[in-house]
Regions:
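Short acidic-hydrophobic, aromatic-tinged amphipathic segments that line or gate anion-handling sites
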Residues: 2-11, 71-74, 92
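Conserved beta-strand segments of alpha/beta enzyme cores
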Residues: 2-4, 89-92, 151-153, 275
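A short acidic, often aromatic-flanked loop/helix-cap motif at beta-alpha or helix-coil junctions
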Residues: 11-14, 98-101, 159-163
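N-terminal Rossmann-like or analogous alpha/beta NTP/dinucleotide-binding catalytic cores
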Residues: 62-148
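Phosphate/ribose-recognition catalytic cores of enzymes acting on nucleotide-derived substrates
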Residues: 200-313
Length: 313
């Protein structure tokens, strides 16, 4: 069954109701989130119901703290792809507006989950809070489930080898510290930036290493610098490469973007959507005294990146 995206919760058709659904923000869909979705999947199988994920767009933080720097770990499109790969049937995108924010926990359950979505089962994380003032708790959700005739399961916390709890915040912290490997450990896959390839100054092409340039818009900004990468093309191919994340101080750029040199690749990608995984942090961004010195360093970056993402080539 192909993933269906449902916007909103009012006046839904019968086929969009009656799911066993995981409830949460699920930014990044990390391994802790995956445990919540697995709980919903068990219920969906037992109830012979569609497997759903209930989340919010925009993220609640965007409504309450509109001036806060970008923090998202994935776009809705990326989230939908990951969830589809996990077997999710329906992704409910609930508009998080002032009406939604005004609902008490009881109103949210009764008006949105029961009347709107007609849920048969809700799975949530051990630390879930919902409703105005974040008054809803796992215990409250269980009580509301009993009162309204839907099942509830609460996923236990998922911890790593060091006993740390998996969270979206820990992923963001790892990325800001230049530790994409740690971010990937928590996510269960590499962190990736997706966007439309835009034209740059063409300097890289003139110097022999053309780059695919993508602006960083709503994503959390990882530590600026150079990364070994893998890029997924629109046709599904994956190409190793090396990328500069930053504003290129040598050439005086001011916008933060990801400029990726795809190894052994010379096709036109302008206007196309690509997704670039950050595999390993190689070095901070540097300002060079000359273009020649910059080229020498890029060649060293290439050798280091190839050893990581394209060994033997």
């Amino acid at each position: 069954m192909k993933l269906k995206i449902v916007h909103g919760w009012k006046d839904l058709p019968a086929q969009a109701r009656g799911a066993a659904a995981a409830l949460g923000n699920f930014d990044g869909v990390h391994r802790g989130h995956q445990q919540v979705i697995a709980e919903a999947a068990k219920a969906a199988s037992a109830l012979k119901a569609p497997l759903g994920v209930i989340t919010f767009d925009p993220h609640p933080r965007r409504l309450f703290r509109p001036t806060e720097p970008a923090f998202r770990l994935m776009t809705i499109e990326q989230q939908a792809r990951v969830l589809s790969g996990m077997g999710v049937d329906i992704l409910y995108l609930l508009p998080f507006d002032f009406q939604m924010a005004s609902f008490s926990d009881k109103e949210f359950v009764e008006q949105v989950l029961v009347e709107g979505l007609g849920v048969k089962h809700v799975a949530a994380g051990f630390d879930i809070s919902f409703g105005k003032g974040r008054t809803g708790s796992p215990e409250a959700l269980r009580d509301y489930g009993q009162q309204n005739g839907f099942g509830v399961s609460i996923a236990a916390p998922v911890a790593g080898r060091a006993g740390d709890k998996f969270s979206s915040t820990s992923v963001r912290d790892a990325l800001r510290e230049g530790q994409p490997e740690e971010a990937a450990r928590i996510l269960g896959r590499p962190f990736a930036i997706e966007g439309v390839v835009r034209r740059g100054q063409q300097l890289g092409r003139q110097l022999g290493f053309p780059t695919a340039n993508v602006e960083i818009v709503d994503y959390v900004v990882p530590k600026l610098g150079v990364y070994a990468t893998r890029t997924r093309l629109p046709d599904g191919r994956e190409v190793p490469g090396v990328a500069n994340l930053g504003n290129n101080p040598t050439t005086g750029e001011v916008e933060t973007r990801l400029e990726t040199w795809l190894f052994d690749f010379d096709e036109d990608l302008y206007g196309q959507v690509i997704e670039t995984q950050l595999i390993a942090f190689l070095r901070p961004e540097l300002k060079f005294d000359s273009i020649e010195l910059m080229v020498e360093q890029i060649r060293r970056d290439e050798a280091q990146a190839r050893a990581i993402v394209a060994p033997g080539f």
